[in-house]
From Swiss-Prot:
InterPro entries linked: Myosin_tail
Protein's UniProt name: Cingulin
First-listed, main subcellular location of the protein, grouped into a coarse class: other
Location of the region described as Tail in the Swiss-Prot/TrEMBL record: 1161-1203
Modified residues (N6-acetyllysine): K579
Annotated region described as Interaction with TJP1/ZO1, given as residue ranges: 54-67
Residues bearing PTM Phosphoserine: 95-96, 135, 137, 140, 155, 165, 214, 217, 258, 276, 338, 351, 1175-1176, 1182
Subcellular location: Cell junction, Tight junction
GO biological process, one term: microtubule cytoskeleton organization
Gene of this entry: CGN
Subunit structure: Homodimer. Interacts with TJP1/ZO1. Interacts with SPEF1.
Amino acid sequence: MEQAPNMAEPRGPVDHGVQIRFITEPVSGAEMGTLRRGGRRPAKDARASTYGVAVRVQGIAGQPFVVLNSGEKGGDSFGVQIKGANDQGASGALSSDLELPENPYSQVKGFPAPSQSSTSDEEPGAYWNGKLLRSHSQASLAGPGPVDPSNRSNSMLELAPKVASPGSTIDTAPLSSVDSLINKFDSQLGGQARGRTGRRTRMLPPEQRKRSKSLDSRLPRDTFEERERQSTNHWTSSTKYDNHVGTSKQPAQSQNLSPLSGFSRSRQTQDWVLQSFEEPRRSAQDPTMLQFKSTPDLLRDQQEAAPPGSVDHMKATIYGILREGSSESETSVRRKVSLVLEKMQPLVMVSSGSTKAVAGQGELTRKVEELQRKLDEEVKKRQKLEPSQVGLERQLEEKTEECSRLQELLERRKGEAQQSNKELQNMKRLLDQGEDLRHGLETQVMELQNKLKHVQGPEPAKEVLLKDLLETRELLEEVLEGKQRVEEQLRLRERELTALKGALKEEVASRDQEVEHVRQQYQRDTEQLRRSMQDATQDHAVLEAERQKMSALVRGLQRELEETSEETGHWQSMFQKNKEDLRATKQELLQLRMEKEEMEEELGEKIEVLQRELEQARASAGDTRQVEVLKKELLRTQEELKELQAERQSQEVAGRHRDRELEKQLAVLRVEADRGRELEEQNLQLQKTLQQLRQDCEEASKAKMVAEAEATVLGQRRAAVETTLRETQEENDEFRRRILGLEQQLKETRGLVDGGEAVEARLRDKLQRLEAEKQQLEEALNASQEEEGSLAAAKRALEARLEEAQRGLARLGQEQQTLNRALEEEGKQREVLRRGKAELEEQKRLLDRTVDRLNKELEKIGEDSKQALQQLQAQLEDYKEKARREVADAQRQAKDWASEAEKTSGGLSRLQDEIQRLRQALQASQAERDTARLDKELLAQRLQGLEQEAENKKRSQDDRARQLKGLEEKVSRLETELDEEKNTVELLTDRVNRGRDQVDQLRTELMQERSARQDLECDKISLERQNKDLKTRLASSEGFQKPSASLSQLESQNQLLQERLQAEEREKTVLQSTNRKLERKVKELSIQIEDERQHVNDQKDQLSLRVKALKRQVDEAEEEIERLDGLRKKAQREVEEQHEVNEQLQARIKSLEKDSWRKASRSAAESALKNEGLSSDEEFDSVYDPSSIASLLTESNLQTSSC
């Protein structure tokens, strides 16, 4: 459409060529009105009865003009001009002029603009409404009726899509003259005039010989002659295309038909040829390739062209048209015909290839756009994940600061422990001093007895007194022997405890060695598993099996959650029982206090009675010397009693100080327990952060191009957080071990204090028992918390193992279930032990030691379970690393797929370039068929490479299957190791049963001790009776006897009794103080138990929430796996589509080769029929009738659709 204004300008002489005009019969106004293209009506008035053929030959200078008709200037004529490679919008390729100008070279308005600008059928605005014109649509060529011109234009545009050409491709060459051609015609015929009689004398100025000065100004001046050569080439090719129109006029004249019918058939032939072949040839070919050889002399140009052969009917028709009205030789006309047909062949080949290339190019551009959009989405996702990195680093810094603070607190605790050790040594020294004093008092008592023996006389009263003294001494000895027996029993129990400690330590060491060996073996196995599982993620069947196993694992986690809830209920019931036990001990302490007060009252009364008796004895004594001696002895004994009382008071003060220290240490233990809870809360926070990290990982897994780097960073951060968690757990364990050491030291100090008196020892033992119970409760709470933490860690690890192999997940689930069962059995055993402890509450001295021993055994069992859980955690961490590596491998594979897609896109672009080169080569000549073959070989090589890659992938899948079999064997071996662990747990249960038997034995011993206590109380009562008897005897003897040596003996007995009373008072005070302390401790323990129960409930709620979160994350992980599987399938489909595109390209190359071979064979066959000279109009019509043209067009369409 851009050329329409240019064609409307005044035109000078055009290029070399021939213009053929048909002079028609008069037709109706309606019919002739439709023949206009530019809106003008032909002038039919002056030449209503003229007809014939007018041939106009244009010379070198544009002067000669030959017309073969009736001699009149006007007349309906149709000019056909066929050009070579021209711009898309050139409408002058086919021209029909309804008026023959008088002399187109003498005036500027020789060719009317409408006629020149509207004759091309390629213009969308062109139309034909004549009754005898056939449609130009290739789909309706076989049809009889006319069709809408819009359909004709659109079909032509669809057959040969227009490609926009730059402005430089417009034919801007000046119209050179053809004087040389006309002069040559004149010289060959001996100066005989051709066409019109007169030579045109008027010469056009040079500026009118150009089409457009504005267009010529685009090119430099030095290309002017080159454009002249091109313009001559256009006119030469134009003439060869359109010369067949003339012969269709002859049968119209002979049969008295409308002259438009023959024209319509010739116009149809011209239209489908030009519409389907000229447009792609202009857009695809380089003008340099289609620059035909042209010279100013048309005859010499025709002689140099070698005809490749064409259809004989067309050749005859064009030959007749060129021959009529011309005086040229027969050889020159035949050369023109062959040249016209030669230019039509490459256009036929170009038409089929252009539509295929455009379709393939559109598909490739769509794929490139889709890949670019995916890349942009991945970049955006990566930018979203970057802010989470800063928060994780900040959390790691906070955790390191907390670890440093905990280390400082540990150092302070060490200093406090050393100070407590020093205080315990001081207390031990004081106890030794008290023992020395006791031995001194016993020696003094012995001396007094010896003195009494010397003073003894034959009187019967003295003998009675001696007997009483002997009896009292025997009783005292029996009491001392009972005390020694009790102390020996205590020493035996302590030795047994030390022996049990050593055995437990040895067993713990052996257990640690076994666990270390198993851990090393497991690390080696897991390393091999990690190496073997790196390439297993592409297997579809394995992914499906893993998904099913993960659903089963979620159900197992739910069962574990129910078991943990049952365990928490069990712990609550235990806490309630312990609380009841503490209440019972409190009642017992109150009862003891009341008994002690009663004993103090009785002793006070006895002391008052003895003092009154002594005063009476002094008043009645006659011998002053004996009285003085007795007074001195009494003073000495009173001073010794005062010293003993002072020592007792100092010991009591030391005991109070020790009790305060114990309370401080208990407070420290509470602080440590609170700190442990804080650490557990921090662990929960860390678990929350880990859950957030997992969510980030799930979001990062959606980014195929970026997920590898993100996964490695998240893995490192997760490992750092897990190391911090492990460090905090280790610190907690170390704190607990140190607390246990301190408590053992406290027990040793209590054992030293037990060497004083039996009552004080019993009370201290009871205190130890209560503290041991508290410790047991704390340890039970810590064990439950650790078990909950281990369960949470196991769940977290199991969540991370969603992407691991199926058998590894099943094995870990079984191991965890077995450990949970072992923990349940241990809990049951603990419950049985606590029931035994409830039965042994009344046992004062031996029960607490047996309970301590059992607690130590339970601690060992808990440590074994902790070690097993730590081993599981290490295994889970290894599996986490393996999962991260698998994710990294999957991301690398995704990148490989993306790179393959980019390579395929690059390969497609290269294939497009090759297709373009192949099209140009096919348009240029058959010689470029070798390059197409080379391209075909390259494509075959690429297909072979892709097939080899597929085979390599299959081999890698087979290798992965073998590796999975090896993994199954390793899993079976680990299961056997788990069975061994079960056996060790059974051994531990047997050991606990043995401890239970020992508890029963200690119970019997406690009953024996109780019976001994009752015997001692009976002895005490008997001694009191004897004392009363002695008092009565002393009163009766004082009435009728003088004071004698027996008085001193009685006074010594009184002193002994006073000492015993004082000892009883001191014991009473100690009991009261210890009872008060025990009451306070019982209250504190009850409060602590309530707090711990609340904490356990909170942990239970947190566990339930965490399990729900784990379920949700498992579902999300399954969805992510399905999404990745879909992406992988999509990538495979794209690769398969690329294979199909390659196969289509190969098929297209083969079809093009077949077409070229077919056309070569056809040209060879037609060259054989070249000399037959078929010139009849009927034969031409039989070859170019609508049915044959439709068959040709449908054949080209079939070729296009097959590509």
